[in-house]
Structures are given as C-alpha cells and as structure tokens.
C-alpha cells in the first residue's frame, strides 16, 4: 500500500477529504487504519501534510517504478532545444553517446552530452583530494557515472534532478570524467 501510494498508482482514490497525496499516504499507509473510524481519525490527524514536494515525487517515481520521470524535469522549451541539437546529431543522451561519432564531440575531442544528475557523492583520492562521483540518468533511464576531478565542494555545486549539457572526457576503460566542472557543465533551464 505504501509503495502504491508513493508511486501515484492510487491517485484516483484521493477525494476532497484529503489535502494532497502526502496526506492520503499518511492517512492510509503510514499508519494503516483498521476501521473506518481509525481512517477518519488519521485524516484529521495528518490534514496539515498536504502534498509531496516535486523532489519527493521525482525520487519516489524513479526509485519505486525504475523509470525516471523526465517530463517532470525537462520542460517543453528545453526538450525542443535538445531535439534541435539531436536532429543535427549533436548532444545525445549520455546513454546514447557513441565515441566513434564525430558529431558527438566538440573541437577539443570532448563528448558533448546531456543528462540529469540523480546523486552527487563526494569522495577522496588516494592523496586526499575531493572529487565528485555523479550518478546520472537521461530520457532513456540509462544510468551512468561521471567523475569530476579537482573540485571545490564549496564552490562547485551540482543540482540533482536538473538537466545539464556538458563537454566531458571519455575513456572506454574509465567512462566519463571532467577536470573543470564550472567550465564544462551547463545547467539547462
């Protein structure tokens, strides 16, 4: 019941007694009522909960269904912009990147791709320097990782669940990486 509520599968059961999806979830799944009286008490007790935030909805849909809700993150303007680039063979989804395709690269030989960061992990090298290990997805729900070397965690911020266009280095052995996060990552929208 919990997963069905958080993934939106029970949205058609929400009526005017509930102030939102989070209120509905709390009243029926968080503290499951045994009788109709208990349901009425839960509805009253959790009334201030309202709705899930956009970030919570994205998180639940991605984690519970296994499909990232790109339509909640990429608006029509960004979608059109990406489509026009992709019509010319440029800026593919990160999971569609082909190292042999010349149009997928900029003048410096870097891979130009778009993606949506899902999680940013701060890690340390053997010498104690911080770097990001960024878990990303795209419209294909393809999961990839990007290593961002030489970062300053106070200055170099990556917003999760926001679309980015980036020029990245690519190695078949190591995958995607960058050494200049502030210069290579461009947030879209």
Predicted regions and their residues:
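Sliding clamp-binding short linear motifs
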Residues: 1-105, 147, 175-189
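A residue-level signal for conserved active-site and pocket-lining positions in enzyme catalytic cores
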Residues: 65, 115, 161, 168
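Hydrophobic core residues within well-ordered beta-strands of beta-rich domains
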Residues: 111-113, 132, 164
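Structured catalytic/nucleic-acid-binding cores of DNA maintenance enzymes
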Residues: 1-9, 134-142, 164-168
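Short nucleic-acid-contacting surface segments enriched for D/E, G, S/T with interspersed K/R
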Residues: 151-167
């Amino acid at each position: 019941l919990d997963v069905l509520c958080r993934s939106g599968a029970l949205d058609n059961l929400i009526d005017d007694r509930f102030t939102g999806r989070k209120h509905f979830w709390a009243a029926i799944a968080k503290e499951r009522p045994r009788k109709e009286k208990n349901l009425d008490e839960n509805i009253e007790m959790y009334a201030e909960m309202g709705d899930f935030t956009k970030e919570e909805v994205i998180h639940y849909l991605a984690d519970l269904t296994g499909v990232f809700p790109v339509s909640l993150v990429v608006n029509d303007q960004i979608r059109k912009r990406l489509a026009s680039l992709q019509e010319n063979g440029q800026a593919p989804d990160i999971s569609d990147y082909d190292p042999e395709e010349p149009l997928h690269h900029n003048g410096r030989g870097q891979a130009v791709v778009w993606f949506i960061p899902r999680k940013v992990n701060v890690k340390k090298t053997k010498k104690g320097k911080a770097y990001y290990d960024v878990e990303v997805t795209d419209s294909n729900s393809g999961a990839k990782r990007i290593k961002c070397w030489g970062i300053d965690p106070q200055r170099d911020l990556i917003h999760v669940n926001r679309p980015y266009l980036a020029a990245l280095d690519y190695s078949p052995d190591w995958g995607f990486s960058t050494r200049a996060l502030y210069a290579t990552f461009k947030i879209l929208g």
